[in-house]
Amino acid sequence: MKGILGRKVGMTQIYSETGTAIPVTVIEVKPNVVTKVLTKQSNGYEAVQLSVFDKREKLSNKPETGHFKKANTTPKRFVKEIRNMNGYELGQSVLVNIFSVGELVDVSGTSKGKGFAGAIKRYNQHIGPKSHGGGGGSQPIRQTGSLGDISGNRVFKGMTMPGHLGSEKATLQNLEVVKVDLKENLLLVKGSVPGAKNSFVVVKSAVKGLPAKAAVKLVDVKEVVLMNELVEKAKKLNVEVKVGMHSDELRPLIEQAELEAAKEKEGE
């Protein structure tokens, strides 16, 4: 098992070489610090405590500050244990590149809070009849149905009734890792992820152990836009553009052609 802590940035879409638009969630994964190593002998189970995102020292108490000093780091905002994650030492950093492109992961977060909701929205119950006497009064169309047998003389726990919706732990399984950006500390996973923007999430290797998918070859949209602009300039200056040419290769040729054109104008 391996895992890492991060923060949901939001959703966007990227493009593959075949032109397919892939909806992805961007997760900011700054270097996680191992702030505690739990062993079976001392704690009864094996786990690693990860911490990420700095917190002001005045907002942490002395025991908390001392705990982070043992790992030679500053107080952190987001702290979680990842079970059965072996091979790490106290104070060691865990980077986003522990996951690879095509790997399947489980992402856990806190779902968006919806406040007080009825049984139709909360449990997807069927709406009541809108005609034949079901439009209101004693039979409103959004009212809950039966709450149990009359012989029970009470409402049993667990009945589907109105109440608070959302703001609870939710996990989406088998999300594909589309891109790993070590330079910007970003992880892009295919599809949506529980929680609002800037909410904390936990990314773990998939529990179901399904095989990884083939890495998708992505297109750099900025590079494509830049190349289109350079190709138009190249046509005007009669610069030869070869198939598969990169902008770094084409730009010097265009600059050289522009200098030659400027010299010709001066000579005239």
UniProtKB/Swiss-Prot annotation:
Q: Could you list this entry's UniProt keywords, alphabetically sorted.
A: Ribonucleoprotein, Ribosomal protein, RNA-binding, rRNA-binding
User: What Pfam families does UniProt report for this protein, alphabetically?
Assistant: Ribosomal_L3
Q: Identify the GO cellular component terms for this protein.
A: cytosolic large ribosomal subunit
Can you provide one Gene Ontology molecular function annotated for this UniProt record?
Answer: structural constituent of ribosome
GO terms, biological process = translation
Its biological purpose is as follows:
One of the primary rRNA binding proteins, it binds directly near the 3'-end of the 23S rRNA, where it nucleates assembly of the 50S subunit.
Query: Record's family?
Result: Belongs to the universal ribosomal protein uL3 family.
Q: How does it assemble?
A: Part of the 50S ribosomal subunit. Forms a cluster with proteins L14 and L19.
Q: What is this protein called?
A: Large ribosomal subunit protein uL3
Q: Which organism is it from?
A: Mycoplasmopsis synoviae (strain 53)
